[in-house]
Amino acid sequence: MVNIRPDEISTIIKEQIEKYETEVRFSAVGTVLQVGHGIARVYGLEEVMAGELLEFEDKTIGIALNLENDNVGVVLMGDDSNILEGSPVKSTGKIAEIPVGEEFLGRVVNALGKSIDGKVEPVCSENRLIEMLAPGIIVRQSVCEPLQTGITAIDSMIPIGRGQRELIIGDRQTGKTSIALDTIINQKDQDVICIYAAIGQKASSVAQVVSTLEEKGALGYTIIVAANADEPASLQYIAPYTAASLAEYFMYKGKATLVIYDDLTKQAQAYRQMSLLLRRPPGREAYPGDVFYLHSRLLERAAKLNQKLGGGSMTALPIIETQAGDVSAYIPTNVISITDGQIFLSSDLFNSGIRPAINVGISVSRVGSAAQIKAMKQVAGKLKLELAQFAELEAFSQFASDLDKATQNQLARGQRLREMLKQSQNSPIPVEEQIAIIYSGINGYLDEIPLQKVSSFIKALREYIVNSKSKFIELIKSNKQLVSEAEEILKQSIQETKATFLASE
């Protein structure tokens, strides 16, 4: 029989008592009154903050959006099927935040920063709030550097600068996402971090974007934030803010960033759904009264910081989908008034084979021209005016039977300029080659080229300049303007290519 030694037992008990630390945890706990459609009403959380994260019994997280006298309206960031009436809800004392860091580059994450690409979860040491205040006036500087999209029509007539907000607006299937992806692909070797926020899209569309970027070698400097169509409205609502927070991390490190929100129409619809379920009073088109603030607080986070803060920038390209070209609807007019210009894509132009289908007449850039390189200003100054005059003349010529020679020449040149600006998908053009293309069109070198052969001639000219006249590219890169030596080389290149091209026809 084992001997019991009371003195040893009492010593052990005394030791345990001495080491025992009392830890009292206080947490505010409420009760679910009602749940359904991704919304829960909770009673008893009297000290909860607006936007605070709440934890339900099944570990589902929600955001407190409505703070009322007798209950709190919570939007759920997960499935509500396991949440029952009467179940407890804990307040966490935290506001929504995500991990941020270089580890996210090349990854696909959800609106909460969790990996959804099947790879290892990124491990980051830093967190950042999803909702951050936009930089103030003093810490900003005016837009002074260009952000080249690689699309000739945009870089010449609707230029975008680093730190600008440029809206891409148009009907469905007019090439809005293609412009955004071309811009990402064109940032290769430009030291620009790109973030693509896919809001309310099909998972297959997001997979296609990922494969395109991977194929073009652009995924390494890109982060994709996806809140797919089958995810709760709350995740579609916060996805753009998550993308902005990831971009801000790099911006405050002195880097240039580009954020694409594809698209904000779906975010507004998700917010409308949440607001109506929370019984907020509906306004125009049933959107809540603060839908303008929804987009303004997001887009104001785009900025070009001053040199004291490292000179980083966040350029925003929000996308808005219109119905039958109606830019005067509620959400389009809101976002047009917030941004620094818009690129309007027309379904009529798209269907008539003009791609990218940019309507130059109503597309503008309010600040980007200040950041355009001098060489582009020199050659593209007249381009927008010539195209506008051509569009007017073309409409008039449909009713006129006989036109004088000058009008016929103007129409012929306009058709060639329009042909010159056509560009295939996922093939951005470097700015030096764009200058050569526009110079040849504006100065009448394309007038003798048959209309259907213009694209072949431009391809031949680009190849000739890259392979045989690389000094032209070096001169533009170093001087940023079309010096007389570069112009002479360009004229010679165009004439030599033209002679060879016309001889082979």
Curated annotation (Swiss-Prot):
Pfam families: ATP-synt_ab, ATP-synt_ab_C, ATP-synt_ab_N. Gene3D superfamilies: 2.40.30.20, ATP synthase alpha/beta chain, C-terminal domain, P-loop containing nucleotide triphosphate hydrolases. It is an enzyme of class 7 (translocase). It is a peripheral membrane protein. Its main location: plastid. Its EC number is 7.1.2.2. GO terms for molecular function: ADP binding; ATP binding; proton-transporting ATP synthase activity, rotational mechanism. CDD domains: ATP-synt_F1_alpha_C, ATP-synt_F1_alpha_N, F1-ATPase_alpha_CD. Produces ATP from ADP in the presence of a proton gradient across the membrane. The alpha chain is a regulatory subunit. Belongs to the ATPase alpha/beta chains family. This is ATP synthase subunit alpha, chloroplastic. The gene is atpA.
